[in-house]
Structures are given as C-alpha cells and as structure tokens.
Regions:
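Short amphipathic alpha-helical elements of helix-turn-helix/winged-helix folds
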Residues: 8-19, 81
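A short alpha-helical element within helix-turn-helix/winged-helix DNA-binding domains
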Residues: 24-35
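Alpha-helical residues within the helix-turn-helix
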Residues: 32, 49-50
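Short, hydrophobic-biased segments on the C-terminal half of alpha helices
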Residues: 45-46
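Beta-hairpin "wing" of winged helix-turn-helix
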Residues: 52-66
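C-terminal regulatory/oligomerization modules of transcriptional regulators
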Residues: 75, 95-143
Length: 143
C-alpha cells in the first residue's frame, strides 16, 4: 500500500511542478488531491526524502519537491525505497534450500525479473503522461 500511495502522490507532485518554478508543494495539498491520509503520506515522504527521491523545505513557504526530474525517477526506485527488494517468494532471495531441485524456483525468479523490468522501465514522468492522456480522452459534458 505504501508504494501505491507513494506513486500516486509523486505523480501529483510532478503534475504540480510541471512547467512551474520548482517551488515546494505543501504535502497537505498532495494528500487532498490524491485522497491519501496526510499522516500516512508524511511517513512515506520522510522515507522518500532519505532515499533521495524528494527534497523538503521547512517554513511557511515549505513543502516537498521532486529531487530529480520526474523522467529520472523510476517506479522501481520508489517501490524498493519503501518496501525493499522485490521478492514474490523467499527463493528469489536465495533463502530456499530447495532452489537447486525445485522446478518452480526459476519461474519465481523470472516473475521477479519481469516485474523489476516493468517497474524499472516506468518513470513518474511516464505515469504523469499516461494520466494526462487519459484525462484528454475523458468525455466532455456540455449543458
């Protein structure tokens, strides 16, 4: 759940910073837009700050900003910062004593590699572009 909220919040942060002056965005605004509990988001962003994904500024004009362009922050980086290494099962971490004789272990390793490939090849910038495209295709209602 942390990763899901974090990706949603980072995409919103990228949207608010897009074409802007790089000023920090209040986390309360991001939480409200993303429908994420503020206290939870504060904990998530503290971890993301330590991981170098976001930067923060204190004070009246404070808030958070992406530490790098959205196109340089992969979803995999966010997930591993919050949840650790991707491991659907223990044997992908080398912790299974049956790995050398288990037919399923290679399947789990392939699944892990595929997931890492998708998440590593997708950036916050990509997600923002996808959301903007979806919004552009939304039906318009006129009164």
């Amino acid at each position: 759940m942390k990763s899901r909220y974090a990706v949603r919040a980072l995409t919103e942060l990228a949207r608010r910073q897009e074409g802007g002056d790089g000023k920090p965005v209040r986390l309360a605004d991001v939480a409200e837009s993303g429908e994420i509990p503020l206290q939870f988001l504060e904990q998530v962003f503290a971890t993301l700050r330590r991981a170098g994904v976001v930067r923060s500024r204190r004070g009246a004009a404070g808030g958070y900003a992406l530490a790098r362009p959205a196109e340089e922050i992969s979803v995999l980086e966010v997930v591993t910062a919050l949840d650790g290494a991707l491991s659907p099962v223990e044997c992908t971490q080398g912790l299974c004593d049956r790995a050398g004789r288990c037919g399923a272990s290679s399947v789990w390793v392939e699944a892990q590699q595929a997931l890492a490939g998708v998440l590593g090849g997708t950036t916050i910038g990509d997600l923002l572009a996808r959301e903007e495209a979806l919004r552009g295709r939304a039906p318009m209602y006129y009164i």
